[in-house]
Amino acid sequence: MKVIDLNCDMGESFGHYKIGCDEEVINYISSANIACGFHAGDPQVMDYTVKLARDNKVGVGAHPGFNDLQGFGRRKIHMTGEEIVNELIYQIGAIRSFCEANGVGLSHVKPHGALNNMASVDENLARAVAKAIKLTDPNLIYIALAGSKMEQIGREEGLKVAKEAFADRQYNPDGTLVSRQEAGAVLHDKETIIERVVQMASEGVVTAKDGTKLNINPDTICVHGDNPEAVELAASIRHMLQEHGITVKSLGTWFTG
């Protein structure tokens, strides 16, 4: 039986600002990556989102990013390895405390935005992220872009690394994600996205923008839930996976690394 995890970034509202359709998308995913207050989120949102995941039996993960609320963590910030380690320990610790307060276990860590993109190709950054996870809790699952420096370094550090693919993002031939600043970086056609996800989950393959077939064999696939159309898309993705005999389950219930 083929098993896959569907993850989604959540808890990215802040104060009076409402971002995402968390309450709707939660019905179709198996893991929630919850913002930790640096690129998005605040204590009230973090607590609410942990409860939302718990009540819907969805796995909870930390989604740490650069300290950049205005840029939503999508702008590059150059920091020392020590600074990265400490900022991630701080953020992971925050969401883990909310998990403990609500009787939930923290299952994984997935870096956000620019930090995720930079660490995917920068060995020193990737090692800093892995070190922060290892120092916080070496049993946490490290969600890393399939084929990236994060995956490589995470394994070298002895962490449980779950390979990630993105449902609605275009890929470069080297396996990195096409920059959001480029046209066509984010896919919008529903049928195309669903077809790609099924191919990822069943065959372990994704087609890059030049037609290259990339062997990624993902353990988890990221779906986005930041607009009403995304809710319908997430529902369709889950339904189609099940139609192809693929079971959707949170990483913490089956993944061993």
Curated annotation (Swiss-Prot):
| CDD domains attached to this UniProt entry | LamB_YcsF_like (cd10787)
Q: What is its EC number?
A: 3.5.2.9
What are the recorded GO MF terms, alphabetically? Answer: 5-oxoprolinase (ATP-hydrolyzing) activity; ATP binding
UniProt superkingdom: Bacteria
Its keywords, alphabetically, are:
ATP-binding, Hydrolase, Nucleotide-binding
Q: GO terms for biological process?
A: carbohydrate metabolic process
- The secretion signal range is none
Disulfide bond among keywords: no
Instruction: Please give the Pfam families that the UniProt record associates with this protein.
Output: LamB_YcsF
Chemical reaction(s) catalysed: 5-oxo-L-proline + ATP + 2 H2O = L-glutamate + ADP + phosphate + H(+)
How does the record describe its quaternary structure?
Answer: Forms a complex composed of PxpA, PxpB and PxpC.
Give the family this protein belongs to, as stated in its UniProt record.
Answer: Belongs to the LamB/PxpA family.
This molecule's function is given as: Catalyzes the cleavage of 5-oxoproline to form L-glutamate coupled to the hydrolysis of ATP to ADP and inorganic phosphate.
Q: Which HAMAP family does the protein's record reference?
A: PxpA (MF_00691)
Q: What is this protein called?
A: 5-oxoprolinase subunit A
Q: Which organism is it from?
A: Natranaerobius thermophilus (strain ATCC BAA-1301 / DSM 18059 / JW/NM-WN-LF)
